[in-house]
Amino acid sequence: MEHLPQIQDTLRIASINRNYCWNGKSPDGRGAQSDLLLESKADRTDYLCEMKFTGGKYAITKNDEEDFLNKIEAFAASKMHNKTHSIQLVMVTTMGIARGEHASIVNQSVVLDNLFSDRKTQIL
């Protein structure tokens, strides 16, 4: 991934042990996939990254929130997740996340400018 160093720097991740795309099923059998997973043993955190590209701030809908919760639940139940790690939902978007009823599901946000400059994370 071309911009992995910028994402790592923006999120202030000390080291990334593995990065990959992931797919699996939640305990109730629903499918789930993540655009990018970053594992950091140093931070004891798995960063589940969702990428959304729009002309403005991305507004998270109720359906998005349910989908993200399903992805988190599915990954938490998978063999790929180190059970001692926390899971953080990271949105990589063009212009950031619009404030709204469902935005609190997101732990951190990376915007397009972060990928091409030294500006840091937008923590929600």
PLM feature spans:
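A cross-kingdom feature that marks ATP-driven nucleic-acid transaction machinery
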Residues: 1-124
